[in-house]
Amino acid sequence: MQAMLTYLKNNRDTTLLGCALILLVLALLQPSIPVKRNIYSYFLVIDITQSMNVVDMSINGKAVSRLEYTKHRLHETISSLPCGTKVGLGLFSGVNVVSLYFPIDVCENFSSIKDTLDHVDWRSAWTADSRVRESMLATAQVLNNFPEPAQVVFFSDGEEAPKLHSFNTRDLSTLQGAGGWLLVGIGSMQGAPIPKFTDKNQLLGYWSHESMQLATGAAPIAAAGLLTRKNDLAENANDRYVAKLSEASMQTMAKEIGASYVRGDSLQALQTAMEKQAPARSEWAPFNLNSVLALAAGLILIGLYLPWLRLIRGFK
């Protein structure tokens, strides 16, 4: 044994080359070890109501609507998710949430997910109303039809149209399973008028203050879910309704249902909040060692042949 150690010490270069060769051969065999990892599944819901057309956000210095900003933020977020993560997309309008598809693997379906995001449009909305609070119940109903658990990430400005009153504020105490959800606030605290477009995206004007109120006689029919609002355009700049990020109401709603809240203007804050959400499940998966072995072999070879290293060894 002592003789072998002496030989290896006296023939260090040969020994290291042999080790590098062994590591490369092992790397070619693609060995792996089982590791336990968390699998995350997200249901990303996008508010496509008309207040999301408000232009009070910016991307690289360019003013954009809240909806365009949401899509941009989702592109960034999805691109950063590791393979194995599943993502499903949904749209919110009125009181309802619809699922475009169940959560699918981000790597295997990356192009399809990105293409779907690119085509999200406010004109897909099926009503002009925006009842964010009630949509929490609708979201839970959608999740019940999913083949496996998923965590909700709900992007919205929190704008309620028509405005909430005591008779049309839905009690959320009966909502079950929302403890891991994440509400993401989109919009500025300064706000801007809500544009009203034609179905060809031509600007007609801006929603008035009156348009955000309940239509006459709405209180008696609130319980029946038949609330409507006025459809008035602002006659002048002073009459335009300014929509701000309803952060306080979203924070209150998140607290009521046991969810978390974060602003969407920070990618890092959003990613951190999503990482804190509970995984859909845990599973054992193979971790390939070939890259680790190949890297180790490469470092050995670099250590042997770098001129500066040989120079240092020459002074010893």
State each model region's role.
Residues 24, 47-49, 89, 139-143, ...:
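DG-centered beta-turn motif at the end of beta-strands
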Residues 39-40, 52-86, 105-110:
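…and closely analogous acidic/polar surface helices at protein-protein or active-site interfaces
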Residues 1-37, 275-316:
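C-terminal signal-anchor/stop-transfer transmembrane helix together with its immediate cytosolic
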Residues 41-43, 253-293:
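Juxtamembrane amphipathic/hinge helix adjacent to a transmembrane helix
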Residues 56-66, 76-77, 99-104, 120-129, ...:
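Second-shell loop/turn segments in exported
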Residues 158-243:
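VWA/integrin I-like adhesion module and closely mimicked acidic/polar interface patches used
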Residues 32-50:
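Alpha-helical transmembrane signal-anchor/signal-peptide segments
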Residues 86-119, 142-143, 273:
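Short beta-strand-loop
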